């Protein structure tokens, strides 16, 4: 065992009673008793609970330092592990020596003083908010989910591929992209027609931050068979909502020789795997979310794991919604995309389980989705989860060059701009499929938090790029 065990290792019983250890962390609270003892709670971020430290008043620095400790001070405590007489923790630390490493300059103005803070306030001090119970728990759950995703895909024989963050292609064809440029905004070069001359820019052409790693991922799937990307993506969508970020992380598997049915199975297996992992590996944090954020959060994940996914064609889903007798805020009609209220009705009230809606009208989906034989729909799917609605979107990709070209032209895109993507269809084309999972949306679902800005360390949104 390390000379400096974590609080998690101590509280989980990996250190035996009587052993001398050194703990390094930060003070959460200090309480003094009339009997000449002080009690500190010290956390190091390794788990939800802090460890209680008992300090006798005969320590050399008791009067000069211990009695001045406040929330946020950093300490190194050496002492013996003893059984705790109080309920709550099996063991505590009897201090032999306490070294104060860092003081809080002015405890009265310390932004993280030991009291309950609103979530809105914590966003204003995002550099300090990981010190709170809430954001500390979110950070550990985020880590657990990320590790589980990598483990899942590795176990399924997928290779992780790093796709570029700077791109010249718009995967979604929506045009909501951040431009990357080194041109002088005060003195933009112009063509003879008065347009900005991007040939003089860093890349010699227009460049953007990526909205998805999918197209690049497809090129590797058509060589390695099974790949996935997991990295940041960017959308310049002027949406200041609880569900949108300008910078977020995406998980995007792509696999060759795969159909839409294979895609739906992969999505189901992955979600159940990662939910099982977080319930087993982060029990302490999940209990906190169930107690303070959303009492249904653990039950919801357990039900998700236990339930087989329902599947329904988009056309049938529209019929279900029309016949439901329910008044929706947004109208229901074939050819219209499902809104969040429609998705949640299907998952929560009709199927009462996760549901895969598939075969959407081609006019509301992207150019790369495989055209079905009816000529009206594409082999697209959305996974809808009770409690949130859409959590995954994916499709079988269009592997036929002529069909892909006509879809691009139909949608006002220039096939030549995607010459390299078209090459994949020219040289040994193969049916393939994939999906995208917004990682932060997954964390929102797991934690029960209402706002996506709480589940990423430093949220980026319209008019907000602090820190």
Curated annotation (Swiss-Prot):
One of its GO terms (molecular function) is asparagine-tRNA ligase activity. GO terms for cellular component: cytoplasm. Keywords: Aminoacyl-tRNA synthetase, ATP-binding, Cytoplasm, Ligase, Nucleotide-binding, Protein biosynthesis. It is an enzyme of class 6 (ligase). InterPro entries: Aa-tRNA-synt_II (IPR004364), aa-tRNA-synth_II (IPR006195), aa-tRNA-synth_II/BPL/LPL (IPR045864), Asn-tRNA-ligase (IPR004522), Asp/Asn-tRNA-synth_IIb (IPR002312), NA-bd_OB-fold (IPR012340), NA-bd_OB_tRNA (IPR004365). Pfam families: tRNA-synt_2, tRNA_anti-codon. Homodimer. This is Asparagine--tRNA ligase.
């Amino acid at each position: 065992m390390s000379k400096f065990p974590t609080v998690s290792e101590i509280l989980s019983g990996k250190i035996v009673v009587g052993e001398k250890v050194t703990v390094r962390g930060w003070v959460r609270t200090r309480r003094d008793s009339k009997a000449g003892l002080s009690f500190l709670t010290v956390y190091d971020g390794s788990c939800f609970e802090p460890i209680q430290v008992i300090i006798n008043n005969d320590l050399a620095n008791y009067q000069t330092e211990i009695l001045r400790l406040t929330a946020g001070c950093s300490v190194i405590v050496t002492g013996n592990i003893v059984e705790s007489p109080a309920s709550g923790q099996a063991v505590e630390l009897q201090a032999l020596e306490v070294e104060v490493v860092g003081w809080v300059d002015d405890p009265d103005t310390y932004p993280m003083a030991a009291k309950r803070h609103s979530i809105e306030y914590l966003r204003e001090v995002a550099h300090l908010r990981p010190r709170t119970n809430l954001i500390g728990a979110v950070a550990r759950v985020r880590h657990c989910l990320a590790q589980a995703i990598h483990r899942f895909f590795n176990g399924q024989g997928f290779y992780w591929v790093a796709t570029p963050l700077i791109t010249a292609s718009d995967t979604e064809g929506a045009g909501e992209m951040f431009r990357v440029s080194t041109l002088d905004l005060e003195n933009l070069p112009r063509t003879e027609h008065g347009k900005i001359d991007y040939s003089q820019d860093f890349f010699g052409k227009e460049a953007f931050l990526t909205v998805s790693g999918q197209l690049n991922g497809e090129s590797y799937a058509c060589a390695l068979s099974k790949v996935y990307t997991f990295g940041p993506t960017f959308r310049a969508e002027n949406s200041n909502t609880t569900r949108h970020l300008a910078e977020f992380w995406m998980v995007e598997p792509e696999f060759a020789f795969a159909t839409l049915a294979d895609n739906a199975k992969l999505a189901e297996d992955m979600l159940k795997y990662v939910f099982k992992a977080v319930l087993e590996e982060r029990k302490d944090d999940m209990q906190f979310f169930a107690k303070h954020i959303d009492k249904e959060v653990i039950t919801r994940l357990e039900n998700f794991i236990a339930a087989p996914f329902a599947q329904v064609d988009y056309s049938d889903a529209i019929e279900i919604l029309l016949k439901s007798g329910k008044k929706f805020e947004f109208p229901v009609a074939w050819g219209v995309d499902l809104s969040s209220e429609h998705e949640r009705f299907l998952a929560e009230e009709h199927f009462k389980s996760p549901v895969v809606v598939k075969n959407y009208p081609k006019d509301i989906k992207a150019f790369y989705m495989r055209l079905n034989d009816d000529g009206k729909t594409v082999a697209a799917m959305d996974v809808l989860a009770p409690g949130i609605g859409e959590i995954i979107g994916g499709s079988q990709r269009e592997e036929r060059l002529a069909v892909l070209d006509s879809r691009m032209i139909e949608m006002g895109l220039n096939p030549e701009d995607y010459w390299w993507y078209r090459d994949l269809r020219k040289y040994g084309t193969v049916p393939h499929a994939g999906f995208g999972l917004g990682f932060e949306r997954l964390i929102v679902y797991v934690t029960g938090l209402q706002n996506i800005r709480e589940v990423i360390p430093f949220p980026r949104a319209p008019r907000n790029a602090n820190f």
